Curated annotation (Swiss-Prot):
One of its GO terms (biological process) is thiamine diphosphate biosynthetic process. The gene is thiC. One of its GO terms (molecular function) is zinc ion binding. Binds 1 [4Fe-4S] cluster per subunit. The cluster is coordinated with 3 cysteines and an exchangeable S-adenosyl-L-methionine. The lineage of its organism: Bacteria, Bacillati, Cyanobacteriota, Cyanophyceae, Synechococcales. One of its GO terms (cellular component) is cytosol. PANTHER family: PHOSPHOMETHYLPYRIMIDINE SYNTHASE, CHLOROPLASTIC, THIAMINE BIOSYNTHESIS PROTEIN THIC. Keywords: 4Fe-4S, Iron, Iron-sulfur, Lyase, Metal-binding, S-adenosyl-L-methionine, Thiamine biosynthesis, Zinc. This is Phosphomethylpyrimidine synthase. InterPro entries: ThiC, ThiC/Bza_core_dom, ThiC/BzaA/B. Its EC number is 4.1.99.17. [4Fe-4S] cluster binds at residues 440, 443, 448. It catalyses: 5-amino-1-(5-phospho-beta-D-ribosyl)imidazole + S-adenosyl-L-methionine = 4-amino-2-methyl-5-(phosphooxymethyl)pyrimidine + CO + 5'-deoxyadenosine + formate + L-methionine + 3 H(+). Catalyzes the synthesis of the hydroxymethylpyrimidine phosphate (HMP-P) moiety of thiamine from aminoimidazole ribotide (AIR) in a radical S-adenosyl-L-methionine (SAM)-dependent reaction.
Length: 483
């Protein structure tokens, strides 16, 4: 599959060849995490590569990784990976979810979804397969084909391994699956360790209860066994596993709100406090962490949610699903959530998990993946502009120049979705001659305002005329009402 990635030119060939040599000397060491090296003052090859991608000094990348404000999810067994960064100092990133369900899809289709997600700009991809196929086969196929970091939710496979019987799951089952995912090259795993048994009564006043699949599994486990969350009690053991592979924690928010009514409630905030504790525990092991967030949040509560996470979790990168800012638009939740995502990114969220038009309705197909990703690339880019990240607006300015100069092909090329931009233009003006035309079908050949080209000479000449006439002539005449 790596050979196919080279053939597809997904990655610079040098990276595919070089990363294997980067990680080879590290294998077998007790701790191979990027944070571990950064805290020793070592700039790894991954850090240097990320610094170039982000146009940041290598020293800053190392300092941010050591501090925990930046992560580089890069399992040493995922050698076909192009290193990337998630953190407040880097550009806002977008994750795409794919995965087979018991009712739909197979390994080949999921790899095709991966390719589509990468094509449309996914910075990371999560495999959320829950059953119906050989989960290990699907996961390894995705990892082998992927140039971007791959994330998983191991509790799904833990439950599948006992054929859905919660009562048969024990603590070792969870840890066995977690290590298997690390061995296969998973770069980050959603670990729902922040949901405690004492949190469960706090969901009583909610409209939608627990909407996290992983959180729901662990809630059922605790209710059946009347014991504490095993991912919490065995958290240090998970850290020991993660640091051997440089797998990153994505601390799951099991109690994220599933509707506007439940946003920022006691259950959500109680779990967030525990996630802060777990972040610091992972850092003691030099293990990288990002923290997951809601969900469904009204616009006026988004800033509070981002700042609260930064406060509780010591500014570990925040990774949010949406959030959706209204609940009344099934079929359009890529829009309702992209609105919230842009605002969350503006306030400091490091990565946005895309939502597709199929959210709450069904398993996304290829077109849904495209629609969701483009919506979220827009949101992330808007956040980068709002945060004044260096170079964030360069592409906008270049496209605007092309638009003003009626350079249609350049406009298409610079678009987030060049195929869609060209398709819409060509619906009414398909002939090649119209690629040089100084109009589109909206205004036609005579009414496009951008045909009015005002030069510096025009302005200078006008200024001289105005100066000669004097300001008095330019003062508006007040007419009497009778006139």
């Amino acid at each position: 599959m790596i050979e196919q990635a080279v053939a597809d030119l997904w990655l610079p060939i040098a990276v595919l060849i070089m990363r294997a040599s980067w990680v080879s000397p590290r294998k077998g060491q007790a701790n191979v995490s990027q944070m571990h090296y950064a805290r020793q003052g070592v700039v790894t090859e991954e850090m240097a590569y990320v610094a170039k991608r982000e146009n940041l000094p290598e020293s800053l990348v190392m300092e941010e990784v050591a501090r925990g404000r930046m992560i580089i999810p890069a399992n040493i067994n995922h050698t076909g990976l192009e290193p990337m960064a998630i953190g407040i100092a880097s550009k806002c990133k977008v994750n795409a979810n794919i995965g087979a369900s018991p009712n739909a899809s197979d390994a080949a289709e999921e790899v095709n979804k991966l390719k589509l997600a990468v094509k449309y700009g996914a910075d990371t991809v999560m495999d959320l397969s829950t059953g119906g196929v050989n989960l290990d086969e699907v996961r390894t196929a995705i990892i082998d084909a992927s140039p971007v970091p791959i994330g998983t939710v191991p509790v799904y496979q833990a439950l599948e391994s006992v054929h859905g019987s919660i009562e048969k799951l024990d603590e070792d089952d969870f840890l066995h699956i977690i290590e298997k995912h690390c061995q296969q090259g998973v770069d980050y795993q959603t670990i729902h360790a922040g949901l405690l048994i004492e949190h469960l009564p706090k969901v009583k006043g909610r409209l939608t209860g627990i909407v996290s699949r992983g959180g729901g599994i662990l809630a059922q486990w605790m209710l059946y066994h009347h014991r504490q969350n095993p991912l919490y009690t065995r958290f240090d053991d998970i850290c020991e596993i993660f640091k051997r592979y440089d797998c990153t924690f994505s601390l799951g928010d099991s109690l994220r709100p599933g509707c506007q009514h439940d946003a920022s409630d006691a259950a959500q905030l109680a779990e967030l406090k525990t996630l802060g504790e777990l972040t610091r525990r992972a850092w003691k092991h030099d293990v990288q962490v990002m923290v997951e967030g809601p969900g469904h949040v009204p616009l006026d509560q988004i800033e509070f949610n981002v700042k609260k996470q930064m406060e509780e979790c010591n500014e570990a990168p925040f990774y949010v699903l949406g959030p959706l800012v209204t609940d009344i638009a099934p079929g359009y939740d890529h829009i309702t959530s992209a609105i919230g995502a842009a605002m969350a990114g503006w306030h400091g969220t490091a990565m946005l998990c895309y939502v597709t038009p199929k959210e709450h309705l069904g398993l996304p197909n290829a077109e849904d993946v495209r629609e969701g990703l483009i919506a979220y690339k827009i949101a992330a880019h808007a956040a980068d502009i709002a945060r004044h990240r260096p170079g964030a607006r360069d592409r906008d300015d270049e496209l605007s120049r092309a638009r003003y100069n009626f350079d249609w092909n350049k406009q298409f090329e610079l678009s987030l979705d060049p195929e869609r931009a060209k398709e819409y233009h060509d619906e009414t003006l398909p002939a090649d001659i119209y690629k040089q035309a100084e109009f589109c079908s909206m205004c036609g050949p005579k009414h496009c305002p951008m045909q009015t080209k005002i030069t510096e000479e025009d302005i200078e000449g006008l200024e001289k005329v105005l100066e000669a006439r004097g300001a008095a002539e330019l003062t508006p005449v007040k007419l009497d009402k009778a006139d």
